[in-house]
């Protein structure tokens, strides 16, 4: 089962993570360590076979491929190219950093088949394509990082998110029960967008956009 992960945060605040200056970068490193443990460096490939000095200790913890390590953290903070085999781990790390800057996040469980059914139901009820669920991620994040395998990433403005929510709310009673429930949960969260926008102005922050990650 896949997930739709949404974050109410200004896109410029997301882009600012890449190439972040100190001490901001140090704060992000600390946040990474808090979530994933101290960012230990990966064992060099061939050096591990050269002898006891370079060999990985037998009791060393096994690091999953999608678990961020120090190199992932450093690459993101320097705005460097992310190798394809480190994209999954790097996106996990980026999500933690985005969530720390966001006004709120929301996660909805959905797979491709279910999302297609929701989109069809919305269209049948008269919701225009520009207000479809996938239209929430119509804009490129422009971070320079490609999506991981099985992932789609993008964003829309806060105004676009609010407009889409209004379109969904108007036809919710016409949707199939399961689709209406799924949309209803999302509407409850999106309904807070005007308040977050007001709060951002009061704190001299940029108004939140809607950053979206869809995983298969």
Q: Which functions belong to the PLM regions below?
A:
Residues 1-206, 215-216:
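Acidic (Asp/Glu-rich) sequence patches and key acidic residues
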Residues 210:
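Intrinsically disordered, Lys/Arg-rich low-complexity segments
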């Amino acid at each position: 089962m896949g997930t739709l992960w949404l974050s109410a945060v200004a896109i410029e605040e997301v882009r600012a993570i890449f190439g972040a200056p100190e001490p901001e970068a140090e704060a992000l490193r600390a946040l990474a360590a808090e979530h994933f443990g101290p960012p230990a460096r990966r064992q060099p490939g061939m050096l591990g076979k050269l002898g006891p000095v370079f060999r990985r200790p037998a009791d060393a913890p096994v690091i999953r491929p999608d678990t961020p390590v120090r190199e992932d953290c450093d690459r993101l903070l320097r705005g460097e190219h992310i190798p394809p085999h480190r994209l999954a781990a790097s996106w996990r790390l980026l999500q933690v950093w985005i969530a720390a800057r966001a006004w709120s996040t929301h996660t909805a469980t959905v797979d491709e088949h279910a999302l297609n059914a929701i989109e069809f139901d919305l269209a049948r009820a008269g919701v225009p394509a520009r207000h479809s669920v996938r239209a929430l991620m119509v804009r490129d994040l422009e971070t320079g990082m490609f999506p991981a395998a099985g992932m789609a990433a993008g964003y829309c403005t806060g105004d676009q998110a609010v407009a889409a929510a209004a379109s969904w709310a108007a036809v919710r009673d016409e949707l199939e029960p399961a689709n209406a429930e799924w949309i209803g949960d999302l509407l409850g969260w999106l309904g807070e967008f005007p308040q977050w926008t007001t709060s951002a102005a009061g704190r001299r922050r940029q108004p939140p956009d809607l950053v979206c990650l869809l995983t298969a």
